[in-house]
Amino acid sequence: AYRWFLRMGLTEKVPDASTLSQNRLRRFNDSEVFQQIFDHIVGQALANGMANGRVLYTDSTHLKADANPRKAVNELRPEGVSEYLEQLNAAVEADRKKHEKKPLPAVKNKPESEAAVKNTKVSTTDPESGFMHRDNKPQGFFYLDHRTVDGKHGIIVDTHVTPGNVHDSQPYIGRLERQIQRFGLEPVAAGVDAGYVTAAVCHLTQEMGVALVPGYRRPNKGQNVYQKKHFTYDPERDVYTCPAERLLTYGTTDRNGYRHYRSDARVCVECPLRDNCTKNKKGEKTLTRHVWEEAKEKANALRLTKWGKKIYARRKETVERSFADAKQHHGHRYARFRGLMKV
């Protein structure tokens, strides 16, 4: 069968096994041939109606790195920079201008030795893997496979590997843009789990004309009885109203894209609900609202519609099934090689 596949005659000499393996290991290093083959297969699926790119489902799964979790060192590594920093900076400046605030001073480009760093656990066996520490997930060195499948028949249209300590939302927009540009897709909806629900992802998907249908995540309960959900936002006046019918007015917009709304401490001191509202020593209540919070609210509202529920329900039949098949039948639980490129 392999002679027929390789178009070899019955008497021709078969290449040695090492010839094939070394070709795979050396010849195509630093090339995009594997990506090109993958893209060609996806193109064939689209051309033959097996996929249509109308609804895309994205999720990530962890692959255990070939690395002993006990063989690790702590290193000071540069802090990760958001993939959406440029768009966020523009939105922050526009919002401050709208509220007649001075522009924020430009961030100075510090030399590498003075850049912001954080203490990071690094494997001595596979330094390119990432130490994963998530709720209800195993702890150790892992890689993440960020996968997107088509909603029609579950055809994989994109896969992207990162270290295990990369947040799901970071590569999402870049990968979605690549799929749209590479294959000419026109998606109307994208189904994702709660890990992708950030203000940036919600805003940028809506800017692309894609309806984001997210999962639900129970918010962390703070120390106060009255949470943010008990305060009502008025977009016309740009104020929050507290349970005691008092106003929290706009103060400023910080570099991270959050507007700060503060109450009048003189009013809060005499409020009978104060003990359930804030523990601030000044008697002042502060709420934050992202400049792209409206997009996040729209995504959550869409999740509750009949159409949104129907779209989200198919995640388990598409991307979750794809991961289950990969793990159960194709050894996708463990990374057989070391290093990001080989994984």
Located regions from the model:
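DNA-recognition alpha helix
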Residues: 1-5
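Anion-binding and metal-coordination hotspots
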Residues: 7-343
